[in-house]
Each structure stands twice: as C-alpha cells, then as structure tokens.
Amino acid sequence: MASADHTRDPCPYVILNDFGAAFSMGTIGGAIWHSIKGWRNSPPGEKRISAIAAAKTRAPVLGGNFGVWGGLFSTFDCAVKGVRRKEDPWNAIIAGFFTGGALAVRGGWRATRNGAIGCACILAVFEGLGIALGRMNAEYNRPVAPVIPDAPASGSTSAAPAAV
C-alpha cells in the first residue's frame, strides 16, 4: 500500500496552484499559437498588428480553458485520494475520467461517456509513460560496486621472473 504524499501542500492550495499553473501554460501557449496564426492569416503590411490582436483576444480564452481543466482535475484528484486513501496512478486515471465527463456533460450522455473514457485513456498513457521512464531512469542510476583489482599471487613477490 502506498503512503500519502506529504511533500505537497494541502488540497485546497494544490487545487489553486494547479489552476494557476494550467492557466499560465494555456495563456503562454495560446499567445504563441494565436500570434503565429494571426501572422499567417493577415494581409501584407498588417502582419505584426494582426498577430498581436489575435494573441490578445484568443490567448486568455485558451488559458481559461486550460485553467478549468487543471482545476477540475486537481479537485477530482484530491477527492479520489481522500476516498481511496491511496497514492497511486489509479487516482489520476479516475480523476481524468471524472474530469473528461464533467467537461463534456453539456453535450449529452454520449459526449459525456466519450469525454470521460477519452480523458481516462490519455491519463493512463501519461501515467504509464511516467512509470516506464521512472524505471528506465532508476536502472541507469543504479549504484554500481567499485571494481577491486586482483590480489597478487602468493609466494611470488618480485616483478622479474626467477633465473633458471
């Protein structure tokens, strides 16, 4: 049985921290993405202005979407940890299932089911890759015993062979 992770803050702080981190990642990534998109889809002579305008209008929206996903996922992750009283990869997969379903619930039963299963599968792949990379990294960083040179043969102390 895995023990609780005491290196992180309590859940309310973790939820707010994850929401902010996801919002920041979405906003920065959205600014880069939408500025490139605005640059490419503008007439000559207005490329810089269009890139800035596209980034200013669309990046906060993408940041908000990322933030909602991160906050919901972190909330469900803390709830699952509290219910299961375990710290293992299944928590993230279950939280991903709930997050995908909650975000798609406005689309009806089929969208909720597909969103929940899809998000759980994505989180399962992420968790599996994390475990595989962790094992691979642990194998490379395994302690190795130092090489001890062989002891000289007994009875022969000189380096030169005896004369016959």
UniProtKB/Swiss-Prot annotation:
**What InterPro entries does the database record attribute to this sequence?**
Tim17 (IPR005678)
Transmembrane regions listed in the UniProt entry: 13-33, 60-77, 89-109, 114-134
Disulfide cross-links: C11-C78
User: Mind listing the GO biological process terms from this record?
Assistant: intracellular protein transport; protein import into mitochondrial matrix
Q: Where in or outside the cell? A: Mitochondrion inner membrane
So what does this one do? Essential component of the TIM23 complex, a complex that mediates the translocation of transit peptide-containing proteins across the mitochondrial inner membrane.
Family of this protein = Belongs to the Tim17/Tim22/Tim23 family.
Output the NCBIfam families linked to this UniProt entry. 3a0801so1tim17
Listed under subunit, the entry gives: Component of the TIM23 complex, at least composed of tim23, tim17, tim50 and tim50. The complex interacts with the tim44 component of the PAM complex.
Name under which the protein is recorded: Mitochondrial import inner membrane translocase subunit tim17
